[in-house]
Structures are given as structure tokens and as C-alpha cells.
Amino acid sequence: MEHKTAYQYSEPASVAHNLLHLRVPTTHRQSVEDFALTVEPKPRSVVSRTDYFGNQVHYFALSEPHSGMTITATSRVVVKTPTPITTSPTWEELAAIGKSREFPLEVRQFLFPSRHIRVMPILSEYGKSAFTRNRPIVEAAMELTTRIYTDYKYDSNATNIFTPLEEVVRQRHGVCQDFAHVGIGALRAQGLPARYVSGYLRTEPPPGKPRLVGADASHAWFSVFCGTELGWVDFDPTNNVMVGTDHITLAHGRDFEDVSPIQGVVMGGGTRAMQVGVDVMPLDAKSHGTTPGATSSQQQQQRSQNK
């Protein structure tokens, strides 16, 4: 798997500071066999640490003039086939535990509003139809997932990272990040711990078409705590599925801002353009069935004026 981000500046930038959430973790559903991070131009050092939520992050700075920057994270990941869930506690049981403060802190912290997911009565009402009396939490969360998939339209031009959740709910258009926020807001409104998950989604080409390198996607979904036995269970409202073998988890937090793949500050540089390419490829497909150098459907052109 490769995640490549390239920046080009119209004028030389003098300084750049960057914080990366690009290290794929080993979890109960995936294991990482290899990871490499490269930055061009090469910084003097790249520092790694674990953040508050347990994600591994990297920091680096460029202090020499540069006209562009490329960050590439490459991972080899084994994704396990999930075990089907046949039973789960009722959502009321879990909500009652949350009220009694019996959840450990690492779970309880996901009960509360966050910067991008505030208390919204409309989301409380939205979730009530799924969370009926004595309903198992997994069943209820799956219905919420289906409702979001049905009620919201995917539109990459409708929102950006600064669009308030209130506007997303009002217009019912957005992208995976927005749909994850809607689900988390509805779950927290029922007293259930829910967190934001960033990651990747492997896509399949249309029948008869070659697989395009770079055509996979950065992705996001939500996770709900389903008790000590099941732990965190992930749901993808963009695709109306429980997370499976095509999903690779990257990081988790309260909302998007906690786990943005790349955060940084650049001094100078004038106008900049950014291009992102993501490729998730089975190992047995690396030598055939792909079209190298194809334009990524996930590539973005972004221009902004640095101050």
C-alpha cells in the first residue's frame, strides 16, 4: 500500500513543519509487516512518537528553501477476515454503563462532544429510529449506517474540511468524513462511545478494465464500542457495510482533526498545488493487471495562498 502526497510551490518556501498520521498500526484485525516513510527533500531528522489516542505520528521540519515536497508512506499489511458477530449487548446496557462512568477512560472519552461533532438535537432524533428498545448494539448501529447511506448523497464538491456538521446535516450532501461525523454524533447522542477512524479502501476496477495504480482512496468511517467482549466495531456509512478486508485502519480519534493524515505550516511558497495518490494492491496483483502511471481518481488539485 502506498500513500503519496506531492506539493509544488510557485515560489520557494523557506520553512515547513509537518505532523503525519501515516503509520498503519497493528490491530486485532490487521498486522503490519513492513513500513517505510520517505520525504523529499530529505529532512535532517524525522521524529516518531505516540499520540494521546495511541496512534503513531511522525514530525519533521524543512529549514532550507525548497520549491516542492513529496511525502510517501509505504506499508505491507495483512488484513484478517473478520469473525461474524452473532450476538451483542443491547444498546441500553452500554448506555447505562456510560452513565455510571464504569467505562475505562480510553472508552469514556469518546462519549463527549468534540470540536467538529457538537451536541445536536437533530442528530439525537435522527438516531432514535435505529435505537429502539432492547435492540442489540451491532444491529442498531448497522441500521444507522444504512440510514446515512440512504439519506445522504456522496458529493465531493459539497463540503470541505471546514464545513460545519450542521450544514452537512441540513443539505445531506458530503463525503466519507462528513458521514462518519454524522454517525458519531448520532451515536454519542444516545449515550454510546463512538470514534472517528481514518484509513484506506481498496477498490476494484470495472469488469474488463485494468486496475489503475493510484486509484484507491483515503477513507473514513466510525467505530462504536460494543462492550468488553466485542470491543470496538467499525461501520462504513459511505458504502453501507461493516468494515471488512478491503478496509485498512490508519488512525482513530474524536473526529477528523485528531487524525488528519498531514498537518503542517509552510512559510513562503506563494501559491501551492497538492496532488494525492493512494494505491492499495494485493501482493499477487503487483506484477500484473495494473496500469502504472495512471491518473488517480483520488488525486486532488488544491491551490492556496500562503501568508
Q: Where in the sequence are the language-model features?
A:
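Linear, non-domain "peripheral" regions
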Residues: M1-E125, S129, N134
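A mobile, often basic/glycine-rich helix-loop segment
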Residues: G293-T295
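A broadly conserved detector of short glycine/acidic/proline-rich loop/turn motifs that flank catalytic sites
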Residues: T26, P43, S75-V77, Y200, ...
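Hydrophobic/aromatic-rich core segments of domains that either
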Residues: T146, Y152, D178-G270
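Secondary-structure boundary elements
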Residues: E93-G174, V182, R254-F256, V280-K286
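Glycine-rich, small/acidic residue-mixed loop/short-helix segments
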Residues: L20-T26, Q30, F35-L37, N239-S260, ...
